[in-house]
């Protein structure tokens, strides 16, 4: 049994990598009835549509990204929430800026690997 009821992927803007990662996890780990899988952004001033390239990639894989970006807030954290980021800088930023932050890991750290994941935003399809 999973100890988390919420899994979040946190990126800068929540318009590309995070929502795509959440959609992939929901697709391959169909726990959406018991575990909330979503994404948030560190700098979301107002809801933005998804990056068109990301929507195209998702669509090609049979995934749907029909949402707008959401800002990370204190209420997103808790002992039942697992939060993933791409690199140590974002992880440290979360711990610096959110007093309720707990269970924040880089994806590689969570699987006991060193390093960060390079954000592919702006790259070729």
Model features per residue range: what roles?
Residues 1-79:
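Conserved active-site segments centered on acidic
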Residues 85-86:
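Short beta-strand scaffold positions
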Residues 92-125:
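Phosphate-binding/catalytic loops
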């Amino acid at each position: 049994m999973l100890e988390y009821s919420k899994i979040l992927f946190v990126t800068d803007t929540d318009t590309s990598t995070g929502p795509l990662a959440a959609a992939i996890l929901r697709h391959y780990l169909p726990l959406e009835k018991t575990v909330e899988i979503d994404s948030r952004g560190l700098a979301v001033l107002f809801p933005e549509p998804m990056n068109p390239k990301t929507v195209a990639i998702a669509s090609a894989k049979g995934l749907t990204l029909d949402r707008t970006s959401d800002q990370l807030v204190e209420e997103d954290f808790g002992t039942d929430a697992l939060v993933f980021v791409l690199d140590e800088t974002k992880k440290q930023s979360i711990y610096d800026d959110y007093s309720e932050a707990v269970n924040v890991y880089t994806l590689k750290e969570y699987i006991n690997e060193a390093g960060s994941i390079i954000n592919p935003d702006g790259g070729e399809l």
